[in-house]
Amino acid sequence: MEKEYVRLISGDGFVFILEKEIACLSGTIRAILNEGIFSEAQKNECTFPDIRATLLEKVCEYLHYNYRYKNQLDIPKFDIPPEMVLELLVTAEYLEA
């Protein structure tokens, strides 16, 4: 079966391409893509005008990390730069990631 991909677009125009299964670990992204009423679902694309690329990139890294190490016993540390912590917390809360 061929993997399905989605495009996540930051407010400053950067595009991140993820497997849909991984992107949908975010409750918000899953809701946007799985509701047929959103045009984003038709295009497999989500635009986040209020999220900068540096934050969206870190969220994408975390979604991959979460997918890879889910149900593992030996999980490496996920590093977050201290200057990014507060903004990333707000972003993760919004994305339910």
UniProtKB/Swiss-Prot annotation:
Keyword hit for Lyase: no
Example GO biological process: ubiquitin-dependent protein catabolic process
GO molecular function, one term: protein-macromolecule adaptor activity
Protein's cellular compartments: Cytoplasm; Nucleus
UniProt main location, coarse: cytoplasm
Gene Ontology CC terms, in alphabetical order: cytosol; elongin complex; nucleus
Keyword Methyltransferase tagged: no
Keywords for the protein's UniProt record, in alphabetical order: Cytoplasm, Nucleus
Family that this chain belongs to: Belongs to the SKP1 family.
UniProt subunit comment: Heterodimer with pof4/ela1. Component of a CRL3 E3 ubiquitin ligase complex consisting of a cullin, the linker protein elc1, the substrate receptor pof4/ela1, and the RING protein rbx1.
Function: As part of the CRL3 E3 ubiquitin ligase complex; polyubiquitylates monoubiquitylated RNA polymerase II subunit rpb1 to trigger its proteolysis; plays a role in global genomic repair. Prevents degradation of interacting proteins by the proteasome.
Stated name of the protein: Elongin-C
Species for this entry: Schizosaccharomyces pombe (strain 972 / ATCC 24843) (Fission yeast)
